[in-house]
């Protein structure tokens, strides 16, 4: 499978986004530079006809903080940080004063501050996301559950070391991601594949979980009794969110993010922590 190729050859949109934001930051008042962001997110409907002001609202967070070692991911992590607004009072109190970005900054490798913006972004994506989440939840765990052994040629340490030695322009050339790989594959696979725009796999969220024919478990996972029993989220805040989504035609990216977090957290709670498993936990 292709795990690792996006990380080591700069295939993810977040890499292009970081470079465009850095370019934009050199002239933050420009109305043209932010328009480049529309090229990399054609799949997000509300950005297709967005004005420079709308783009600044979505992508302008800490735009000029280019010296920050976590610059590439600051916007994404700020968006996901909105989930904390829906935490219960007890959870808010338990995380009060903890800054995960400060914690991560203290664990960066030697010389990290001198790396290029792209190299920093690749390290963060590989270390935080791929190693800590992607390979287990979407790779090995899914494969092993179905008696399939995944093979990951792009994760061969020799391939990783080679790609790490490449100049940035051979990985991300302008907004052309996986540049060297595409050049090498030209003539070996059809041009329609080589030149095909990158298409993220996006699952529907609110349109499924809040539909009339939604899965049976959803009502239970979003119920006030489950929210109060698990104690992670605020029942009032979640109820307000659900009401807002149901009144809207479509949910925002952040609303979908919160909805997914609530349902996923409660499924984990039900599976591993609920009272019916208390005997196992105590054994």
Model-derived features: where do they sit?
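Active-site adenylate/phosphate-handling loop in enzymes that bind or generate adenylated species
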Residues: 1-48, 116, 135-159
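Adenosyl-5′-phosphate
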Residues: 49-283
């Amino acid at each position: 499978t292709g795990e690792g190729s996006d990380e080591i050859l700069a295939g993810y949109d977040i890499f292009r986004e970081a470079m465009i934001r850095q370019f934009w930051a050199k002239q933050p008042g420009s109305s043209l530079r932010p328009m480049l962001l529309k090229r990399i997110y054609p799949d997000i409907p509300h950005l297709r006809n967005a004005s420079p002001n709308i783009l600044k609202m979505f992508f302008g967070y800490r735009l000029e903080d280019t010296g920050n070692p976590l610059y590439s991911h600051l916007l994404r992590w700020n968006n996901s940080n909105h989930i904390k607004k829906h935490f219960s009072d007890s959870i808010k109190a338990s995380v009060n004063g903890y800054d995960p970005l400060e914690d991560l900054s203290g664990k960066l490798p030697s010389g990290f501050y001198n790396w290029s913006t792209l190299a920093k972004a690749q390290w963060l994506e590989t270390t935080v996301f791929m190693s800590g989440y992607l390979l287990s939840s979407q790779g090995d765990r899914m494969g092993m559950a179905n008696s399939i052994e995944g093979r990951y040629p792009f994760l061969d340490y020799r391939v990783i070391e080679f790609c790490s030695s490449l100049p940035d322009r051979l990985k991300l050339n302008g907004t052309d991601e996986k540049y060297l790989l595409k050049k090498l594959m030209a003539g070996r696979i059809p041009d329609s594949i080589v030149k095909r725009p990158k298409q993220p796999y996006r699952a529907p969220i609110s349109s499924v979980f809040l539909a009339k024919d939604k899965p049976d478990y959803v009502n239970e996972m979003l119920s006030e009794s489950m929210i109060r029993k698990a104690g992670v989220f605020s029942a009032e805040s979640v109820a307000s969110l659900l009401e807002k989504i149901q009144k809207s035609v479509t949910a925002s990216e952040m609303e979908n993010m919160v909805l997914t977090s609530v349902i996923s957290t409660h499924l984990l709670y039900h599976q591993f922590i609920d009272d019916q498993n208390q005997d196992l936990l105590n054994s």
